[in-house]
Amino acid sequence: MFMKAPVRVAVTGAAGQISYSLLFRIASGDMLGKDQPVILQLLEITPALEALNGVIMELEDCAFPLVAGITGTDDANVAFKDADYALLVGARPRGPGMERKDLLEANAAIFSAQGKAINDNASKGIKVLVVGNPANTNALIAQRNAPDIDPRQFTAMTRLDHNRAMAQLANKLGKTVNDVKKMLIWGNHSSTQYPDLHHCEVDGKVAIDQVEQDWYENDYIPTVQQRGAAIIKARGASSAASAANAAVDHMRSWALGTDEGDWVSMGIYSDGSYGIQEGLIYSFPCTCKNGDWTIVQGLEVNDFSRGKMQATEQELAEERDAVSHLLP
Protein backbone atom coordinates (compact mmCIF):
# COMPACT_ATOMS: atom_id res chain seq x y z
CA MET A 1 0.00 0.00 0.00
CA PHE A 2 1.31 3.45 -0.89
CA MET A 3 2.20 5.38 2.24
CA LYS A 4 2.18 9.16 2.36
CA ALA A 5 4.95 11.16 4.04
CA PRO A 6 4.33 11.37 7.80
CA VAL A 7 2.61 14.43 9.26
CA ARG A 8 3.40 15.87 12.68
CA VAL A 9 0.59 15.95 15.22
CA ALA A 10 1.10 17.90 18.45
CA VAL A 11 -1.13 17.09 21.42
CA THR A 12 -1.09 19.04 24.70
CA GLY A 13 -2.23 17.68 28.04
CA ALA A 14 -1.03 14.40 26.60
CA ALA A 15 -1.03 12.44 29.87
CA GLY A 16 -4.57 13.51 30.76
CA GLN A 17 -7.85 11.63 30.58
CA ILE A 18 -9.04 12.94 27.20
CA SER A 19 -5.67 12.31 25.59
CA TYR A 20 -5.65 8.75 26.95
CA SER A 21 -8.72 8.13 24.79
CA LEU A 22 -7.48 10.32 21.94
CA LEU A 23 -3.89 9.32 21.22
CA PHE A 24 -4.62 5.69 20.38
CA ARG A 25 -7.33 6.78 17.93
CA ILE A 26 -4.93 9.16 16.18
CA ALA A 27 -2.22 6.50 16.12
CA SER A 28 -4.55 3.92 14.56
CA GLY A 29 -5.48 6.23 11.68
CA ASP A 30 -9.02 7.13 12.76
CA MET A 31 -8.33 10.87 12.48
CA LEU A 32 -6.29 11.37 9.32
CA GLY A 33 -6.87 8.13 7.44
CA LYS A 34 -5.46 4.62 7.34
CA ASP A 35 -2.83 5.63 4.76
CA GLN A 36 -1.41 8.61 6.68
CA PRO A 37 1.59 8.00 8.96
CA VAL A 38 1.92 10.32 11.96
CA ILE A 39 4.69 11.59 14.20
CA LEU A 40 3.23 12.30 17.64
CA GLN A 41 4.67 15.31 19.51
CA LEU A 42 3.29 15.20 23.03
CA LEU A 43 3.35 18.10 25.49
CA GLU A 44 2.84 17.94 29.25
CA ILE A 45 3.67 20.01 32.30
CA THR A 46 6.90 18.95 34.02
CA PRO A 47 5.26 17.08 36.96
CA ALA A 48 3.33 14.90 34.49
CA LEU A 49 6.30 13.84 32.35
CA GLU A 50 6.66 10.49 34.10
CA ALA A 51 2.99 9.71 33.51
CA LEU A 52 3.43 10.81 29.89
CA ASN A 53 6.32 8.40 29.58
CA GLY A 54 3.95 5.62 30.63
CA VAL A 55 1.48 6.63 27.89
CA ILE A 56 4.31 6.66 25.34
CA MET A 57 5.33 3.16 26.47
CA GLU A 58 1.76 1.99 25.85
CA LEU A 59 1.64 3.66 22.43
CA GLU A 60 4.87 1.85 21.54
CA ASP A 61 3.40 -1.42 22.80
CA CYS A 62 0.48 -1.11 20.38
CA ALA A 63 2.95 -1.32 17.48
CA PHE A 64 0.72 0.88 15.33
CA PRO A 65 1.93 0.66 11.71
CA LEU A 66 1.10 4.36 11.12
CA VAL A 67 3.25 5.72 13.96
CA ALA A 68 6.49 7.03 12.49
CA GLY A 69 7.78 8.53 15.74
CA ILE A 70 6.81 9.76 19.21
CA THR A 71 8.34 12.48 21.36
CA GLY A 72 7.31 13.62 24.82
CA THR A 73 8.35 17.01 26.20
CA ASP A 74 7.53 19.85 28.59
CA ASP A 75 8.82 22.42 26.08
CA ALA A 76 6.12 23.91 23.83
CA ASN A 77 8.72 24.95 21.25
CA VAL A 78 9.74 21.31 20.84
CA ALA A 79 6.16 20.00 20.83
CA PHE A 80 5.00 22.39 18.09
CA LYS A 81 8.15 22.17 15.94
CA ASP A 82 7.02 21.80 12.30
CA ALA A 83 3.60 20.54 13.50
CA ASP A 84 0.94 20.11 10.80
CA TYR A 85 -1.88 19.55 13.30
CA ALA A 86 -2.26 20.58 16.93
CA LEU A 87 -4.89 19.44 19.41
CA LEU A 88 -4.78 21.69 22.46
CA VAL A 89 -6.35 19.46 25.07
CA GLY A 90 -4.53 20.55 28.21
CA ALA A 91 -6.16 23.39 30.15
CA ARG A 92 -6.48 24.55 33.72
CA PRO A 93 -9.57 22.91 35.22
CA ARG A 94 -11.89 24.94 37.41
CA GLY A 95 -10.91 24.47 41.04
CA PRO A 96 -13.04 24.93 44.18
CA GLY A 97 -14.06 28.55 44.69
CA MET A 98 -12.74 29.63 41.30
CA GLU A 99 -14.84 32.16 39.46
CA ARG A 100 -15.21 31.84 35.69
CA LYS A 101 -13.09 34.98 35.37
CA ASP A 102 -10.26 33.32 37.35
CA LEU A 103 -10.50 30.32 35.06
CA LEU A 104 -10.35 32.55 31.97
CA GLU A 105 -7.26 34.32 33.27
CA ALA A 106 -5.46 31.12 34.31
CA ASN A 107 -6.05 29.66 30.85
CA ALA A 108 -5.14 32.90 29.10
CA ALA A 109 -1.57 32.49 30.36
CA ILE A 110 -1.39 28.91 29.03
CA PHE A 111 -2.93 29.64 25.63
CA SER A 112 -0.96 32.85 25.07
CA ALA A 113 2.25 30.88 25.49
CA GLN A 114 1.03 28.08 23.23
CA GLY A 115 -0.12 30.55 20.56
CA LYS A 116 3.34 32.11 20.53
CA ALA A 117 5.04 28.71 20.36
CA ILE A 118 2.79 27.69 17.45
CA ASN A 119 3.51 30.97 15.69
CA ASP A 120 7.27 30.57 16.06
CA ASN A 121 7.69 26.84 15.47
CA ALA A 122 4.78 25.17 13.68
CA SER A 123 4.19 24.66 9.97
CA LYS A 124 2.50 27.78 8.57
CA GLY A 125 -0.32 25.54 7.33
CA ILE A 126 -1.01 24.09 10.78
CA LYS A 127 -4.57 23.15 11.73
CA VAL A 128 -5.28 23.90 15.40
CA LEU A 129 -8.18 22.50 17.41
CA VAL A 130 -8.74 23.74 20.96
CA VAL A 131 -10.46 21.20 23.19
CA GLY A 132 -9.47 22.56 26.61
CA ASN A 133 -12.15 24.77 28.16
CA PRO A 134 -13.27 27.51 27.87
CA ALA A 135 -12.47 26.31 24.34
CA ASN A 136 -13.76 29.19 22.22
CA THR A 137 -11.99 31.88 24.20
CA ASN A 138 -8.84 29.76 24.63
CA ALA A 139 -8.78 29.43 20.82
CA LEU A 140 -9.19 33.19 20.48
CA ILE A 141 -6.28 33.80 22.87
CA ALA A 142 -4.00 31.36 21.03
CA GLN A 143 -5.00 32.84 17.66
CA ARG A 144 -4.31 36.42 18.76
CA ASN A 145 -0.83 35.34 19.89
CA ALA A 146 -0.01 33.80 16.50
CA PRO A 147 -0.01 36.79 14.12
CA ASP A 148 1.84 34.91 11.36
CA ILE A 149 -0.77 32.14 11.13
CA ASP A 150 -4.05 32.60 9.25
CA PRO A 151 -6.82 33.05 11.88
CA ARG A 152 -8.92 30.50 9.95
CA GLN A 153 -6.50 27.83 11.13
CA PHE A 154 -7.55 28.16 14.78
CA THR A 155 -10.75 26.32 15.68
CA ALA A 156 -12.62 25.33 18.85
CA MET A 157 -14.47 22.10 19.40
CA THR A 158 -18.26 22.16 19.31
CA ARG A 159 -18.41 18.75 17.62
CA LEU A 160 -19.11 17.11 20.98
CA ASP A 161 -22.22 19.30 21.32
CA HIS A 162 -23.10 18.51 17.69
CA ASN A 163 -22.80 14.77 18.34
CA ARG A 164 -24.74 15.02 21.61
CA ALA A 165 -27.50 16.92 19.82
CA MET A 166 -27.69 14.28 17.07
CA ALA A 167 -27.93 11.44 19.57
CA GLN A 168 -30.66 13.12 21.65
CA LEU A 169 -32.74 13.82 18.55
CA ALA A 170 -32.30 10.32 17.14
CA ASN A 171 -33.34 8.82 20.50
CA LYS A 172 -36.45 10.99 20.66
CA LEU A 173 -37.59 10.01 17.16
CA GLY A 174 -36.64 6.34 17.42
CA LYS A 175 -34.05 6.72 14.68
CA THR A 176 -30.29 6.24 14.47
CA VAL A 177 -27.76 9.05 14.14
CA ASN A 178 -27.26 7.94 10.52
CA ASP A 179 -30.74 9.31 9.79
CA VAL A 180 -29.80 12.78 11.14
CA LYS A 181 -28.24 15.34 8.80
CA LYS A 182 -27.40 19.05 9.05
CA MET A 183 -27.32 19.27 12.82
CA LEU A 184 -26.25 22.73 13.89
CA ILE A 185 -24.71 24.21 17.03
CA TRP A 186 -24.41 28.00 17.14
CA GLY A 187 -22.09 29.90 19.45
CA ASN A 188 -20.08 28.98 22.52
CA HIS A 189 -19.15 25.55 23.86
CA SER A 190 -20.98 26.34 27.07
CA SER A 191 -24.49 26.22 28.50
CA THR A 192 -25.50 29.11 26.19
CA GLN A 193 -24.84 27.11 23.00
CA TYR A 194 -27.84 26.85 20.69
CA PRO A 195 -28.68 23.50 19.07
CA ASP A 196 -30.81 24.57 16.09
CA LEU A 197 -33.26 22.06 14.61
CA HIS A 198 -34.78 24.42 12.03
CA HIS A 199 -32.42 23.24 9.27
CA CYS A 200 -31.62 19.79 10.60
CA GLU A 201 -33.14 16.84 8.73
CA VAL A 202 -34.19 13.41 9.94
CA ASP A 203 -34.95 10.94 7.16
CA GLY A 204 -34.86 13.89 4.75
CA LYS A 205 -37.60 15.81 6.57
CA VAL A 206 -37.08 18.97 8.64
CA ALA A 207 -36.46 17.99 12.26
CA ILE A 208 -38.29 20.87 13.95
CA ASP A 209 -41.55 19.74 12.29
CA GLN A 210 -41.18 16.27 13.84
CA VAL A 211 -40.98 17.38 17.49
CA GLU A 212 -43.19 19.42 19.81
CA GLN A 213 -42.02 23.00 20.33
CA ASP A 214 -42.40 22.60 24.09
CA TRP A 215 -40.08 19.56 24.12
CA TYR A 216 -37.60 21.40 21.89
CA GLU A 217 -37.41 24.53 24.06
CA ASN A 218 -37.76 23.08 27.56
CA ASP A 219 -36.27 19.61 27.28
CA TYR A 220 -34.03 19.18 24.26
CA ILE A 221 -32.09 22.46 24.31
CA PRO A 222 -31.31 22.34 28.08
CA THR A 223 -30.39 18.64 27.86
CA VAL A 224 -27.83 19.29 25.13
CA GLN A 225 -26.55 22.45 26.86
CA GLN A 226 -26.08 20.70 30.21
CA ARG A 227 -24.99 17.25 29.04
CA GLY A 228 -21.41 17.76 30.24
CA ALA A 229 -22.58 18.54 33.78
CA ALA A 230 -24.91 15.51 33.73
CA ILE A 231 -21.99 13.23 32.86
CA ILE A 232 -19.84 14.66 35.66
CA LYS A 233 -22.72 14.04 38.10
CA ALA A 234 -23.20 10.45 36.91
CA ARG A 235 -19.59 9.41 36.37
CA GLY A 236 -17.84 11.52 38.97
CA ALA A 237 -15.53 12.72 36.20
CA SER A 238 -15.89 14.78 33.07
CA SER A 239 -16.62 13.33 29.64
CA ALA A 240 -13.28 12.16 28.27
CA ALA A 241 -13.89 9.40 25.72
CA SER A 242 -16.73 11.28 24.01
CA ALA A 243 -14.64 14.46 23.92
CA ALA A 244 -11.74 12.56 22.37
CA ASN A 245 -14.09 11.02 19.81
CA ALA A 246 -15.44 14.46 18.88
CA ALA A 247 -11.88 15.79 18.46
CA VAL A 248 -11.14 12.95 16.04
CA ASP A 249 -14.39 13.70 14.18
CA HIS A 250 -13.65 17.45 13.97
CA MET A 251 -10.14 16.99 12.62
CA ARG A 252 -11.15 14.22 10.23
CA SER A 253 -13.91 16.36 8.72
CA TRP A 254 -11.56 19.35 8.41
CA ALA A 255 -8.68 17.37 6.93
CA LEU A 256 -10.56 14.87 4.77
CA GLY A 257 -13.82 16.71 4.01
CA THR A 258 -17.49 16.59 5.00
CA ASP A 259 -20.05 14.31 3.39
CA GLU A 260 -22.02 15.59 0.41
CA GLY A 261 -25.34 17.09 1.53
CA ASP A 262 -24.29 17.43 5.15
CA TRP A 263 -22.36 19.86 7.33
CA VAL A 264 -20.64 19.98 10.70
CA SER A 265 -20.46 22.46 13.59
CA MET A 266 -17.07 24.09 14.21
CA GLY A 267 -15.99 26.94 16.46
CA ILE A 268 -14.28 29.21 13.94
CA TYR A 269 -13.09 32.76 13.43
CA SER A 270 -16.23 34.80 12.67
CA ASP A 271 -16.12 36.82 9.46
CA GLY A 272 -19.37 38.61 10.34
CA SER A 273 -21.65 35.94 8.84
CA TYR A 274 -25.18 35.89 10.30
CA GLY A 275 -24.43 39.23 11.99
CA ILE A 276 -22.04 37.67 14.51
CA GLN A 277 -19.21 40.00 15.60
CA GLU A 278 -16.11 39.57 13.53
CA GLY A 279 -13.14 37.99 15.28
CA LEU A 280 -15.03 35.96 17.88
CA ILE A 281 -14.51 32.20 17.81
CA TYR A 282 -18.13 31.14 17.30
CA SER A 283 -19.67 27.85 16.24
CA PHE A 284 -21.15 27.92 12.73
CA PRO A 285 -22.37 25.26 10.30
CA CYS A 286 -19.46 24.44 7.99
CA THR A 287 -18.63 22.29 5.03
CA CYS A 288 -15.03 21.20 4.57
CA LYS A 289 -13.14 20.41 1.38
CA ASN A 290 -9.44 20.15 0.53
CA GLY A 291 -8.47 20.92 4.13
CA ASP A 292 -10.43 24.17 4.31
CA TRP A 293 -13.78 25.10 5.86
CA THR A 294 -16.59 27.26 4.50
CA ILE A 295 -19.51 28.67 6.51
CA VAL A 296 -22.87 27.48 5.18
CA GLN A 297 -24.59 30.69 4.05
CA GLY A 298 -28.20 31.69 3.44
CA LEU A 299 -29.91 29.81 6.27
CA GLU A 300 -33.07 31.50 7.43
CA VAL A 301 -32.91 32.69 11.05
CA ASN A 302 -36.24 33.23 12.82
CA ASP A 303 -36.75 35.41 15.90
CA PHE A 304 -36.41 32.49 18.32
CA SER A 305 -33.09 31.47 16.79
CA ARG A 306 -31.82 35.04 16.60
CA GLY A 307 -32.39 35.51 20.34
CA LYS A 308 -30.49 32.32 21.16
CA MET A 309 -27.67 33.17 18.74
CA GLN A 310 -27.27 36.63 20.24
CA ALA A 311 -27.26 35.32 23.83
CA THR A 312 -24.33 33.00 23.15
CA GLU A 313 -22.57 35.71 21.12
CA GLN A 314 -22.97 38.05 24.11
CA GLU A 315 -21.32 35.50 26.40
CA LEU A 316 -18.38 35.12 24.01
CA ALA A 317 -17.95 38.89 23.81
CA GLU A 318 -17.95 39.06 27.63
CA GLU A 319 -15.33 36.31 27.84
CA ARG A 320 -13.18 38.12 25.29
CA ASP A 321 -13.53 41.39 27.20
CA ALA A 322 -12.58 39.66 30.48
CA VAL A 323 -9.19 38.70 29.01
CA SER A 324 -8.77 41.66 26.64
CA HIS A 325 -6.01 43.15 28.82
CA LEU A 326 -4.03 39.96 28.16
CA LEU A 327 -4.52 39.97 24.38
CA PRO A 328 -1.91 41.46 22.05
Swiss-Prot record:
Active site, renumbered: 189 (proton acceptor)
GO biological process: malate metabolic process; tricarboxylic acid cycle
One of the record's GO molecular function terms: L-malate dehydrogenase (NAD+) activity
Enzyme class: oxidoreductase
Binding site for substrate: 94, 100, 133, 164
Pfam family of the protein (one): Ldh_1_C
E.C. code: 1.1.1.37
UniProt keyword terms in alphabetical order: NAD, Oxidoreductase, Tricarboxylic acid cycle
Reactions performed catalytically: (S)-malate + NAD(+) = oxaloacetate + NADH + H(+)
Keyword Magnesium annotated: no
Binding residues for NAD(+): 13-19, 107, 114, 131-133
Family matches, as InterPro entries: L-lactate/malate_DH (IPR001557), Lactate/malate_DH_C (IPR022383), Lactate/malate_DH_N (IPR001236), Lactate_DH/Glyco_Ohase_4_C (IPR015955), Malate_DH_AS (IPR001252), Malate_DH_type2 (IPR010945), NAD(P)-bd_dom_sf (IPR036291)
Family designation: Belongs to the LDH/MDH superfamily. MDH type 2 family.
Protein function: Catalyzes the reversible oxidation of malate to oxaloacetate.
Name used for this protein in its record: Malate dehydrogenase
